[in-house]
């Protein structure tokens, strides 16, 4: 995949988001919903997600021992505490999205599918038996239609039949694990729709085919995590992957005119990190490929489909508001600062562009050892803030080479106390972008 060369404005505020407690509450609502329909969740992955979030809420993400909860996970992608947290968020946020739609409308035939999604491995990245996650994707798409006010059926041969007024959409869902499977699965979905859309005309009723495709693993073969410098950058990284996939499928003849298959809905569902400001996210990104041969004659149907996604309200009244990123730090009287006497050597190592990639590739033990290597600290009103080698590497990785070189030269001068103070303040603002001085009162 080509590397993005665009520029993005620096973030000034954080994204709104949900707390760990809110996500635990979502799982509890799901548990009650499932139990109310006779579906047991004890000792299932739902139960384990709840146990993880409960400990994370009470003791902090860094103090959870996930291997005691997810005992069968030995994959190398699950090393650091943040890895586990992001993978859990991916699962919980998708389940919460499904529940949100089912609270609006419960489709016929949903119970059999709900029983299936409770099973499966704990994480999609590790799921070798794809049935559970395939059905979960069907329910993810179903939720959009439920939220948009459609009457939905899941009790037919078609994955989803969604109706609004006289418009009926026959939707086949496919999760594709690599680009080689794109053509096979798209053509299979086409044949399924052609076989299942009613051929007998009914007065005032119109039927359309839609193909929904989860291409997460096509874009990201590891089915893991993604990363962005800012929120705009993170969004564009995923959208770029979707555009690349849409170009690959242009030559595949998966559309039809009669019955009309009018749209292919590509979606990526992936968790990740935003660097500035530091924040975790789960992203559901979509791109829609339209059958140009039917775009005019099926304009009303396409407008309905557009409203399914564009018109959906994904806001949550529980979201904590965005916060302004601090650009200055006022040090009160009595503030204490310290910096390693070897800071010049540490800066030389941390300023190497290879250092950032090297740290990300470290094993859990190596990562922890680097995290324990302190380069400096500040004590404000008796509260201690330490900065590790990882903090220094992450800070310098965001700065241009000229800035890093000049900073190293200034630090090499033993009497440049101002430069040392500036470095500590910049490290503080990098690590604590939303610092509130009143919290130290």
Q: Could you say what each language-model-derived stretch is?
A:
Residues 1-128, 134-135, 139, 143-147, ...:
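Charged, structured surface patches that assemble and position nucleic-acid processing machinery
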Residues 148-160:
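Short, well-structured beta-strand/strand-turn elements
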Residues 145, 160-162, 168-177:
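Conserved catalytic cores of phosphodiester-cleaving nucleases, focusing on short active-site segments
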Residues 180:
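Glycine-rich nucleotide-phosphate-binding loops and adjacent flexible coil segments
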Residues 150, 176, 216:
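Residue-level marker of positions within ordered structural domains that often coincide
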